[in-house]
Amino acid sequence: MVTPSLTAQADDKQARLKHLIKRLPNLPGVYKMLGKNGDILYVGKAKSLKSRVNSYFAKTIDHPKTRALVSRIHDIETIITRSETEALLLEQNLIKEHRPPYNVLLRDDKSYLYVFISADQPYPRLAYGRGKAKHQKGKFFGPFPSAHAAKETLVLMQKMFQMRQCTNTFFRQRKRPCLEYQIKRCRAPCVGLVSAEEYAADVQNTIRFLKGDSSDIHTTLIEKMEHSAEALDFEKAAFYRDQLSMLREVQSRQAVYTVQGEADIISIASQAGMTCVNVLTVRGGRVLGGKNYFPDVDSNEPINDNLSAFITSFYFQVTDDLPAEIIISHELPDQMALQEALSTYFEAKTVIKTNVREHRAEWLDLAKLNAHNALKTKLGDYLELHARFAALKEVLEPVSQSSIDTIECFDISHTMGEATIASCVVFDQGGARKRDYRQYAIHGVQDGDDYAAMAQAITRRYKKHPLPDVLLIDGGKGQLSMAKNVLTELGLLNDTLLIGVAKGEGRKAGLEVLHFIEHEPLDLPMDSKALHLIMNIRDEAHRFAITAHRKKRDKRRSSSVLEAIPGLGEKRRRDLLNHFGGLQQLLGASQQELEGVNGIGKVMANTIYKVLHE
C-alpha cells in the first residue's frame, strides 16, 4: 500500500472543498468550518452561503488568523435559514454552544459590571457584580464599562445614602454594628439603629440617583434638612447637610445631559493594520464611562463589516444589556437584520442609528475621539512590542531559527511552602493574552519544593494545551533541567524553545541570564529590547502568581487559627467570622461578646477566648 504524500493529500483536500463550494446555494444560512477530527473551528453566517464561503478560498488572504483557519479546514457544513436575521441568531447560538477557537474576536470578553439593589429583604442590599444574575430579585443599574467606575459609584452611594453592602447571612447574625457603621458608610439596620421608613427613603434616593434624578433628591434633602433644623434635631440636620454637600460635589464632576437618554455609542477607527472600537455607555442621560476594544479583525476588510462583526460579538457574547438606542459611527451592511436579531434575542426593542444631532452627536464625537486616541496609543505600544519580539528573534538566532509568535512563562509563589500557586501567562505580538492565563493550586508535593511544584504545573498545562513557540521558566539550570525532563516524558521537548531566566549577580533586575538546553548561556545588556520583553513577561507571571498565592494564604490563615480550637466545627467557625466581620474583629471580642453568638455557650466562649489570647 502506497501512502500519498502530504502534497497530494493537500491537493485532494483543496479539490474536495472546491467541489463542495460549487454545490452551495445562494441562500442565507450558517456555515461551520470543521477540522481534521470533525472539531468545529469557526462558525459564520451569510446572506449568500456560496459567496461567503467561496471568499475564503478565492482571494489572497492577508490576515494571519484567517490564513491559519483556512489551512486547517477539512470539511464545511451548512444550515440554510429563512432569513439573514435567523442566520445571525443561529450563528450566535452555535458559537455559545461550541466556543470555536477562531470565533474569538475580543481578547477581553468579560461581562460588564452592574450595581444591584436587592428587592427580597426588608432592608435591601447594595452590591455590584458582572452580568445580570437571573436568580437575583432586584434592580440592576449600568452597565459600567470598568471596575473602577462601578466601585466609585458604589462608594459614592455608601457615603451619600449609607445602604448596607453585607451579605444576608452576615446581616442576620449581627448583634452589634460593624466597621461600616463606624466610618459612616452604613446606618446599621442590622441592629435597628435606623427605622424601616428612613432606610426605605435612603433606598429610594439611591435608586433615583442611579436613574439620573439627582435634582429631585437635591430638593428632598433641602426640605429634610430644614425640617430637622426647625425641630431642633441638629444631628439629623447635619446628616442631610453632609448628603447635600456630597451630592453637589458629584453633580459638579459628572457630564449630565438634560435628556433622559439610554444609549450605547460605538465608534470604530482603523490604521496600519490595527482596529480600535470605543463603546461609550450612557444611562439616565449620564455618561457612565467608556471602554476601548481592539478586536482581532482583518483590517483589509471594509470598516463597516468589521464594525458589524464587533457589534454582533459584543451584544451576543459580552454584555447582557440592550439599550433603547445604539449610535454608531458607520452604517452597517446588515443594519436592519442586526437590529431585528438583537431585539429578538433580548426581547426588547432597540434602534441602530448613524445620523444623529444635538447631544447624541456630542456623544458620538466623544466616542470617535476616544477611539482615535486609543488607537494612536496602542499603535505606539504595538510598534515597541513588535520591535522587542524582533530583537528577541535576533538574539535567539544562534539557538533556534523558528518563528516566535507566542511566549508563555511560569512562576511559583508560596510563603515557606504554604499555599503554593503556579502561574502561567501568555503573550503574543499583540501583548498579553489574559483570557489564556492560568493559575494552578499545587497539591501533593513537599512544602517549599519549587522543582516539584513547577513540574506539576507544566505537566497539567501541556497535557491539555499546545506548547508556545518559546517557554520561559523563572529559574536557572535546575528549573530548566526539570522542565526538560517533564517535556521529554510528555514527548513534547522538540515542540518549543525552552529558556530558563535566572537572576543575575546580586539578583538585581536587568542582570538576568538566559539558560538553554544545548547552548551556552546568554547574558544580555541592560538596554536590550529582548531582555526588556523577557523581564516584562517574567514580572507579569510573578504578579499573577503572588496575587493568587496571597489570596489563598490569607483565606487559609483566617480559618486555621479557629481550626486549632477543640470542639469548634466548620459551621460555628463560619458563624463566628460572619458575626464579627472577620478574624481581626473576632480577636478584639470579649468573652461575653463571644457568648452572644448563636451556638456558642459559656464554656465554648471561654475556650475560644483562651486559645485566641494565649
UniProtKB/Swiss-Prot annotation:
Start and end residues of each UVR domain: 215-250
Entry-linked Pfam families: GIY-YIG, HHH_2, UVR, UvrC_RNaseH, UvrC_RNaseH_dom
PROSITE patterns, per database record: GIY_YIG, UVR, UVRC
Primary location: cytoplasm
Assigned keywords, A-Z: Cytoplasm, DNA damage, DNA excision, DNA repair, Excision nuclease, SOS response
Gene Ontology MF: a single term: DNA binding
Gene Ontology CC annotations of this record: cytoplasm; excinuclease repair complex
Residue ranges of domain GIY-YIG in the record: 26-104
Cytoplasm keyword on record: yes
GO biological process annotation, one example: nucleotide-excision repair
Subcellular location: Cytoplasm
InterPro entries, per database record: DisA/LigA_HHH, GIY-YIG_endonuc, GIY-YIG_endonuc_sf, GIY-YIG_UvrC_Cho, Hlx-hairpin-Hlx_DNA-bd_motif, RuvA_2-like, UVR_dom, UVR_dom_sf
Cited function: The UvrABC repair system catalyzes the recognition and processing of DNA lesions. UvrC both incises the 5' and 3' sides of the lesion. The N-terminal half is responsible for the 3' incision and the C-terminal half is responsible for the 5' incision.
Similarity field: Belongs to the UvrC family.
Subunit structure: Interacts with UvrB in an incision complex.
HAMAP family (UniProt xref): UvrC
Name the record gives this protein: UvrABC system protein C
Species the sequence originates in: Psychrobacter sp. (strain PRwf-1)
